Structure formats: C-alpha cells, structure tokens
C-alpha cells in the first residue's frame, strides 16, 4: 500500500461514493428501484451511498450481478478503502511490530 506510487496522496474512495457520484446518476432508475432489484431495503442502499455501511461480500455479489462487473470490483474497492483509511490510524502500532526475518 504505502509502496504504491499511484495511490500516494489520493484520498481513499468508499464504494458508496462511487455509486452516489458516478454510477447511479448515469442510470435512468430511481434508488427505490435499484434497491428492489438488488433485493435490499432502501435504507441499506442509502447507508452504503452515505458511506455508513461497507460493501460486504454478499452486497458485492449483488452489485456485481446488477452491474455485470462481478463482485471482485466492489470487494477490492472496499478493501482498498478500509486499508487506506485504517493504516494511518494504526501507524504507531504497526511501527512497533517487529517483522520475522526472511
């Protein structure tokens, strides 16, 4: 992560932000219909869009099926967001860990 020059300095993107800002506006569907097609409540969809809930493996399967891009895209986006958000918060703890010699 820290070694990836492409990700340095960029704010992590929650999958909900991508859905809210780019994906859903491009669809000609109300959010209620999207939630219905995903088989989830409107509240669950809104919680993801508002970045209050993560994209779980089950949700990634639903999103991947709905958008046709598979679950890995959504899980990878969530994983990257989680790691990039958590790593700075854990910097001291991580610095104190002594790695195993290779």
Region locations from a protein language model:
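Short, basic-rich loop-to-helix N-cap that marks the start of a DNA-contacting helix
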Residues: 52-65
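Intrinsically disordered, low-complexity and often Lys/Arg-enriched segments
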Residues: 1-7, 102
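Short, charged recognition helix plus adjacent turn
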Residues: 75-102
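A short, Lys/Arg-rich alpha-helix, primarily the initiator
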Residues: 5-29, 73
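Residue-level detection of the helix-turn-helix DNA-binding "recognition helix"
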Residues: 39, 50, 79
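Short alpha-helical DNA-recognition segment
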Residues: 29-47
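Alpha-helical structural signal
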Residues: 20, 42-45, 71
């Amino acid at each position: 992560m820290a070694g990836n020059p492409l990700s340095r300095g960029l704010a992590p993107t929650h999958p909900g932000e991508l859905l809210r800002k780019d994906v859903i506006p491009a669809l000609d569907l109300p959010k209620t219909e999207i939630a219905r097609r995903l088989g989830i409540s409107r509240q669950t969809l809104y919680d993801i869009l508002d970045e209050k809930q993560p994209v779980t493996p089950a949700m990634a399967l639903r999103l991947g099926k709905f958008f046709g891009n598979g679950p890995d895209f959504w899980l990878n986006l969530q994983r990257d967001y989680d790691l990039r958000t958590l790593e700075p918060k854990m910097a001291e703890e991580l610095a104190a860990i002594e790695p195993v010699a290779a």
